[in-house]
Amino acid sequence: MTSRERAESKVGITGMPGVGKTTLAMEVANLARRRMTVCGFITLEVREAGRRVGFDVYDISTGSRVPLARVGAGAVTVGKYVVDLSACDVIKRILDAASCDLLVVDEIGAMEVKCPNFLVSLEKAVKSSPRVLAVVHRNYLDVAKRLGIEVLWLSRENREAVREEVLRKLGLPLA
């Protein structure tokens, strides 16, 4: 792979719940920060007394964190979670302002897709970013393909190999 191809890499990771997709995305973002500007968002689990009760959106650029979804009843739901549409404004702002060497999107999934204009903002951000690392829910692989994101399957067994491949494709050292 040439340096130009590496400089324009758009890589996705998918896999079953709990295999470490978000952990890998955070690890790559932290490694990349040593060499380049990184922007985007990570969807973090919120736990209380050891039980998952929701998700927050973490803005990589600012370090701010806002609620995305919580267990409960409401108008916009994904499974047992109610999506906080005010978080959609934050996600849109993050994507619309994306101007960095590596855009991290965690995730392209059901909660994010519930946000009005998410896919429009996502497409613009992906097309304008030289490097992209996206966590892609397995039900949204078609979206990743349409955006030119090459998706790798992550499992507990291949975690280290996928990590190395992601770093290589993004032009980062195998640290």
From Swiss-Prot:
Catalyzed chemical reaction(s)? a ribonucleoside 5'-triphosphate + H2O = a ribonucleoside 5'-diphosphate + phosphate + H(+)
Q: Which domain of life is it from?
A: Archaea
Gene3D superfamilies noted in UniProt:
P-loop containing nucleotide triphosphate hydrolases
Gene Ontology MF term list: ATP binding; ATP hydrolysis activity
Where ATP binds, per the record, is at: 15-22, 102-109
* One Pfam family matching this protein: NTPase_1
Which InterPro entries does the record associate with it? AAA+_ATPase, Nuc-triphosphatase_THEP1, P-loop_NTPase
Q: Which family does it belong to?
A: Belongs to the THEP1 NTPase family.
The protein's name: Nucleoside-triphosphatase THEP1
- Tell me which species this is from: Pyrobaculum neutrophilum (strain DSM 2338 / JCM 9278 / NBRC 100436 / V24Sta)
Q: What is the lineage of its organism?
A: Archaea, Thermoproteota, Thermoprotei, Thermoproteales, Thermoproteaceae
